[in-house]
């Protein structure tokens, strides 16, 4: 199974074999900021190792085609999102239904996913934003406009993630399905470093089109 995927290469592989993948469901997974500037085995001083491969495996073993890569350097969230939107466009133009595509992001990856939602402007795409909304985001990042089927997940003890209902209410695009889940692991921002069932399971349900 793939764990570290280079997005351009894997998209080309998918498109080459597109006739056999029209019924597949796809997850674009966008990891947190720490992993941008640290190796896979490096430990965060408070939260430990980012279990990137293990997170991807959880999605793969549940039948998803996972598209992901370890970002290097402190990438610009909006610029990186443009590349993801182009890859999504390639999939949809080749017969993949938008409602079978889910963009999942943790922490900074969640902000990249929010830019994907804004730029793609497709109400049929699925999104899961994890620990990636703060109370001052409306003021500091006014250009983000939610669009799609949106699930937000945040941890009660995490200062970097709160309810994003204000962003939803300030977005102009049609949002057919919107749900928020507050979890309570006591792990603060460290909960997203691991494939905990508290956020993995609802993410999988959402990506399967179960919006209840």
Where are the regions that the model predicts?
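C-terminal catalytic histidine-bearing segment of alpha/beta-hydrolase fold enzymes
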Residues: 177-212
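Short, surface-exposed "cap/lid" segments of acyl-processing enzymes
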Residues: 21-58
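Hydrolases whose catalytic domains are alpha/beta-hydrolase-1, hotdog thioesterase
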Residues: 112-116, 138
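Alpha/beta-hydrolase active-site loop
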Residues: 50-55, 73-98
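Conserved alpha/beta-hydrolase
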Residues: 56-75
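The feature captures the conserved acid-bearing segment of alpha/beta-hydrolase catalytic domains
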Residues: 126-189
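Bacterial Sec-dependent N-terminal signal peptides
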Residues: 1-23
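Gly/Ala-rich beta-loop-alpha elbow adjacent to hydrolase catalytic centers
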Residues: 103-113
């Amino acid at each position: 199974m793939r764990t570290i995927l280079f997005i351009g290469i894997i998209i080309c592989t998918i498109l080459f074999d597109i006739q056999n993948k029209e019924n597949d469901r796809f997850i674009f997974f966008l990891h947190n900021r720490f992993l941008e500037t640290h190796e896979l085995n490096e430990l965060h001083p408070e939260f430990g190792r980012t279990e990137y491969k293990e997170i991807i495996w959880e999605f793969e073993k549940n039948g998803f085609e996972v598209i992901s890569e370890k970002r290097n350097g402190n990438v610009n969230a909006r610029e990186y999102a443009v590349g993801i939107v182009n890859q999504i466009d390639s999939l949809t133009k080749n017969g993949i239904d938008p409602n079978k595509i889910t963009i999942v992001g943790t922490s900074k990856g969640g902000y990249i996913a929010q830019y994907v939602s804004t730029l793609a402007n497709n109400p049929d795409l699925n999104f899961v934003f994890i620990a990636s909304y703060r109370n001052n985001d409306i003021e500091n990042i006014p250009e983000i406009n939610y669009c799609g089927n949106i699930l937000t997940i945040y941890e009660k003890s995490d200062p970097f993630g709160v309810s994003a209902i204000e962003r939803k209410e300030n977005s102009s695009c049609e949002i057919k399905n919107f749900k928020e889940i507050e979890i309570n692991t006591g792990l603060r921002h460290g909960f997203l470093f691991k494939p905990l069932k508290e956020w993995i399971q609802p993410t999988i349900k959402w990506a399967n089109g179960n919006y209840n």
